[in-house]
């Protein structure tokens, strides 16, 4: 029986990539800086002390981080009891966004640029907004700027409730984000609006990676908070991903947990399981691992690292999240059978100590555990697509166009 358990720790970078200078991210190091802040006692909100992640250490994260940056994370040394193969990978996609990272992991790097809304104010062209307003029968929008999602609902949420005008905003990523109140605007209305925006963007050749529904609740700016009902309406992959190949060539199953299905536009997904919160995502993953059949990929994205702690520059929260995940990792490891592969990686960085609120261009860990495979150092992988190619070889699929087998 062959099964792959692929877990993406969203934004868990381990040091700036060779091309980080093009993104003003030289020196960024999501993992390393979290470890440093914990060691120095500067990440003690809701937790305390040095970062405690024994299971990630056992899978080789410390050694991988050292190979990525040239030095061990503060307070750690070489781990001799590693049970997995470990390495690190750099991205060849042109962006440092979720879609690019995940598609490249699945063997389809995004080499051309996405369309970005670069203006900080009046970010979306009036002609585009007018098309959306006409088709959606809205009275208008508010926002139309670069913004943090939590900040903009605090600032404009009350006006949105009063006027029923959706809040639209973007970031340095290729995204069109829409925030609406679940009760006063309606969740189904928000999803319908996002589908309309996705259709119009595609119709008029705006190569925008994602339209994101950002629902929130609360009665005033002191109470507004985003809910777990976020949805991403992604552009469809340009080529066949390894998850689609598994279904097409082996009639296999791809179980998508969290926002994975949204990232691939539902393409190459057999079963989509919506799950929110780090603990619940881990529980759902464990549940699906226990019943996974032959030729199955269980594919989980742990979004909280990025959305709750990376973008919000919350070092303590990120550290606490890593420790929570590590506490669930022992059970995950115990479920991996002789011919299975457990792969832990990330899609980009989001250093919570870095300037601004955006992603950081970083190398990502590649940790592969299987009781049936001899452990070794995987080296510096030149593309995330090596993960997709490795999965293709493992399932005896036709070759992917990018990447090399690591095993």
UniProtKB/Swiss-Prot annotation:
InterPro entries, per database record: Alkaline_phosphatase_core_sf, DeoB, Metalloenzyme, Phosphopentomutase_DeoB_cap_sf
Enzyme Commission number, as recorded: 5.4.2.7
Compartment(s) of residence: Cytoplasm
Catalysed reactions listed for this entry: 2-deoxy-alpha-D-ribose 1-phosphate = 2-deoxy-D-ribose 5-phosphate; alpha-D-ribose 1-phosphate = D-ribose 5-phosphate
Pathway named in the protein's UniProt entry: Carbohydrate degradation; 2-deoxy-D-ribose 1-phosphate degradation; D-glyceraldehyde 3-phosphate and acetaldehyde from 2-deoxy-alpha-D-ribose 1-phosphate: step 1/2
Chain positions recorded as Mn(2+) 2 binding sites: 306, 311, 359
Presence of the UniProt keyword Metal-binding in the record: yes
Similarity field: Belongs to the phosphopentomutase family.
Origin superkingdom: Bacteria
GO biological processes: 2-deoxyribose 1-phosphate catabolic process; 5-phosphoribose 1-diphosphate biosynthetic process; metabolic compound salvage; nucleotide metabolic process
HAMAP family associated with the record: Phosphopentomut
Highest classification ranks of the organism: Bacteria, Pseudomonadati, Pseudomonadota, Gammaproteobacteria, Enterobacterales
Cofactor note: Binds 2 manganese ions.
Uppermost EC category: isomerase
Protein name: Phosphopentomutase
Keywords in alphabetical order: Cytoplasm, Isomerase, Manganese, Metal-binding
GO CC terms in record: cytosol
UniProt function note: Isomerase that catalyzes the conversion of deoxy-ribose 1-phosphate (dRib-1-P) and ribose 1-phosphate (Rib-1-P) to deoxy-ribose 5-phosphate (dRib-5-P) and ribose 5-phosphate (Rib-5-P), respectively.
Molecular function in Gene Ontology: magnesium ion binding; manganese ion binding; phosphopentomutase activity
Cofactor: Mn(2+)
Amino acids binding Mn(2+) 1: 10, 347-348
SUPFAM superfamilies: Alkaline phosphatase-like, DeoB insert domain-like
Pfam families per the UniProt record, alphabetical: Metalloenzyme
